[in-house]
């Protein structure tokens, strides 16, 4: 699934599954279905693409923080909706097959630095947002689990992309064990999936805001160039020519 081009739609259109907020130079994209553990239904999928585009094109926003409302960060596709809505199932299957789902910052081609602030359980498709963030911090009570295999599904993009952040064996173990094992925030930090643990958990938003403001002190052009240089190497690899490392073309 390749990186796309940012899109934006009128900010007057209300969000029903997300909260889009701004605090100084930091924009916040908050999953807002706490009663459903922030699972993604068809409406949220559509809103995510619009929200990423809106924040990326806002000149006042230098850094974007992604987090969840309530006790969960993000728990992937709303299985209940998919099970009860044949049209939603067909559409999700088609977009997955055709690689046209655009719900993370990477999918939507966001140029600005993105911080994932994992505030609770991150499960299944929620791992996409960890894999595709530039920086990941987590509350001390955050957990990570990949239940796909436990419900007869195969891990796809999220497992592959998550392996860019940490040991392949750890990703494979999580994929094979499924819902029977949860990775703690401490373990995720030890393996390199997370760069900071926040304790107490209630301090997560403040710490993410501070980190965002620190990053925002750098010129936006430099931030975008640095981000794209790093991601381009991860996507395309490097080639050694005349004793120097360059991104492959």
Can you describe what each PLM-predicted range is?
Residues 108-220:
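Crotonase-fold acyl-CoA enzyme core
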Residues 45, 49, 53-57, 79-119, ...:
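An acidic, glycine-rich surface segment that forms the CoA-thioester-binding/catalytic face
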Residues 67-69, 75-78, 132, 140:
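A secondary-structure boundary/capping signal
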Residues 2-28, 32, 175, 180-217, ...:
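Amphipathic alpha-helical segments at domain termini/boundaries
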Residues 29, 33, 48, 66, ...:
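Terminal peptide-recognition signature
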Residues 71-75, 123, 145, 230-233:
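Short, active-site-adjacent cap segments at secondary-structure transitions
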């Amino acid at each position: 699934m390749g990186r796309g081009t940012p899109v934006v739609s009128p900010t007057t259109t209300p969000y029903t599954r997300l909260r889009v907020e701004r605090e100084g130079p930091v924009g916040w994209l908050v999953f807002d279905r706490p009663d459903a553990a922030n699972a993604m239904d068809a409406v949220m999928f559509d809103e995510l693409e619009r929200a990423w585009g809106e924040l990326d094109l806002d000149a006042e926003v230098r850094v974007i923080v992604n987090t969840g409302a309530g006790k969960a960060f993000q728990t992937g596709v709303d299985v209940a909706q998919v099970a009860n809505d044949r049209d939603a199932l067909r559409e999700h299957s088609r977009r997955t097959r055709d690689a046209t789902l655009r719900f993370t910052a990477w999918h939507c081609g966001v140029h600005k630095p993105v911080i994932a602030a994992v505030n609770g359980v991150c499960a299944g498709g929620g791992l996409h947002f960890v894999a595709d963030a530039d920086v990941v911090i987590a509350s001390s009570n955050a957990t990570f689990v990949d239940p796909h295999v436990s419900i007869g599904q195969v891990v796809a993009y999220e497992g592959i992309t998550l392996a860019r952040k940490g040991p392949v064996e750890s990703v494979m173990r999580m994929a094979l064990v499924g819902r029977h094992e949860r990775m703690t925030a401490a373990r995720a930090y030890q393996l390199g999936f997370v760069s900071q643990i926040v304790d107490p958990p209630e301090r997560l938003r403040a710490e993410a805001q501070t980190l965002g403001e620190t990053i925002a002190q750098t010129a936006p052009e430099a931030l975008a160039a640095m981000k794209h240089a790093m991601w381009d190497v991860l996507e395309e690899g490097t080639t050694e020519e005349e004793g120097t490392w360059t991104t492959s073309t």
